[in-house]
A protein has these predicted regions:
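N-terminal ligand-binding/catalytic initiation module
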Residues: 1-143, 147-151
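Adenosine-phosphate binding glycine-rich loop
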Residues: 155
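Conserved small/polar residues in nucleotide/adenosyl-binding loops
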Residues: 158-161
Length: 161
């Protein structure tokens, strides 16, 4: 429901592609372009990206055609809570560990985690990308940048041989 009291309808999905080496792991995106076909491909791709890390993680991807752009905090929170009313029974630390993606930042992940906690009465590591107040990482905003630097340093070492 928007702030004017109008009911809004959006489609939401979670594609769990592969959990052969660990729980499903992949982002959730909120963007008008999201559809099942795109998420199936992204979940497939996420399986391979995760396997290359050598961490025990499978691949998944999710999202909705809801776009948080231009929405109030209350509109975003109401949507996320409605989304979690369906998603919560399919995620968990040993099952599926979603993260943020396009249109899903710390605020949205925090709303998801809060609703998950309310529904399950558990304070577990079910979501990555949440704020520090919910047990998130201190350097989450910089993590991708650090990863790029480490990758570049390894590339330079490899090419200098």
């Amino acid at each position: 429901m928007d702030d004017k009291g109008n009911i809004q309808t959006n489609m939401g999905y979670r594609v769990q592609h592969n959990n052969a080496i660990g729980p499903y792991k992949g982002g959730i995106r909120f963007h008008a372009s999201v559809n099942l076909s795109i998420l199936k491909f992204l979940a497939f791709e996420q399986t391979f990206k995760n396997s290359l890390t050598t961490l025990p993680m499978g691949g998944g991807k999710g999202g909705s055609d809801f776009s948080p752009r231009g929405k109030s905090n209350m509109e975003v929170m109401r949507f996320v809570q409605a989304f979690m009313l369906e998603l919560w029974r399919h995620v968990g630390p040993e099952t599926d560990v979603p993260a943020g993606d396009i249109g899903v930042g710390g605020r949205e992940v925090g709303f998801m985690f809060g609703m998950y906690k309310k529904l399950t009465h558990e304070f577990t590591g079910t979501f990555t990308g949440k704020g520090r107040e919910f047990g998130g990482s201190l350097i989450r905003p910089e993590a991708t940048g650090y990863g790029n630097i480490y990758f570049l340093m390894d590339c330079l070492l490899y090419t200098s041989d």
